[in-house]
Design a protein with these regions (language model features):
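Oxidative protein folding and maturation machinery
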Residues: 1-208
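Short active-site neighborhood of thiol/selenol oxidoreductases, capturing the structured segment around
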Residues: 211-223
């Protein structure tokens, strides 16, 4: 496994950062819920130390050999260092400098997926829709295949959270920007046409007596 230079480059990060990432996960949750006091201050300090350790391991691994698939892959695991209250233009400029997301070779890895999840973690759940809009607006400027794959990934995530109103909004706003892939287009159409409270699409059926019936002309109300 460790024979190739790129595998060694990846392992240099994973081996050193695995424990630190585990600690960070625990400390983040602790800092969220623990009341003010000396212990909270100590936990925040420890969290900062562990995050710095991960970033150091990451930078060291990337610099082993710049330009390789491994280094490009690892670059999307860097911490997203900006204040979410900054203007959209500033955030987009930061992303274009640090996370270009234009490398098709990374599309079948989890690099871009990891970036999107990390981006969302900077926001409260109530702001996820706006955060995803920022990501999609950024991606829309680049490669359509990458945009479509990540749009599909975002839809899957919002579907798993049962955020159906957000799915409708995203489908309306970005559905025309995705590729002509049949499955994605069909999925987008289902979110816009069949959302809760929307009027059902009209269609014609044949009864067992051979009579054609149009849904909109049936006597019973429908939604």
């Amino acid at each position: 496994i460790l024979e190739s230079a790129e595998n060694q480059q990846l392992y240099a990060y994973v081996a050193q950062a695995e424990l630190a990432e585990y600690k960070i996960g625990i400390l983040r949750e602790l800092v969220k819920i623990y009341p003010q006091g000396e212990f909270l201050t100590a936990a925040e300090k420890e969290l900062g130390k562990e995050k710095a350790q991960v970033n150091t391991c990451l930078d060291k691994a990337i610099k082993q050999k710049n330009g390789t698939f491994a280094s490009r892959y690892l670059s999307y695991f860097r911490e997203i260092n900006f204040n979410i209250s900054e203007s959209t233009d500033k955030k987009m400029n930061f992303l274009s400098r640090n996370f270009p997301m234009n490398d098709l070779e990374l599309l079948n890895s989890n690099a871009y997926h990891h970036f999107i999840v990390s981006y969302l973690k900077k926001y409260e759940p109530s702001e996820y829709l706006n955060a995803v809009r920022e990501i999609l607006d950024y991606l829309k400027q680049g490669n359509q295949e990458i945009f479509s794959k990540m749009f599909d990934y975002v839809l899957t995530g919002f579907e798993s959270m049962e955020r159906y109103d957000d799915l409708y909004q995203l489908s309306v706003e970005y559905g025309n920007s995705c590729s002509t892939d049949g499955n994605l287009k069909t999925r987008v159409k289902s979110y816009t046409d069949l959302r809760v409270g929307a009027k059902a699409p009209d269609f014609e059926i044949e009864t067992i007596d051979g009579e054609d019936v149009v849904l909109s002309q049936m006597k019973n109300d429908y939604t």
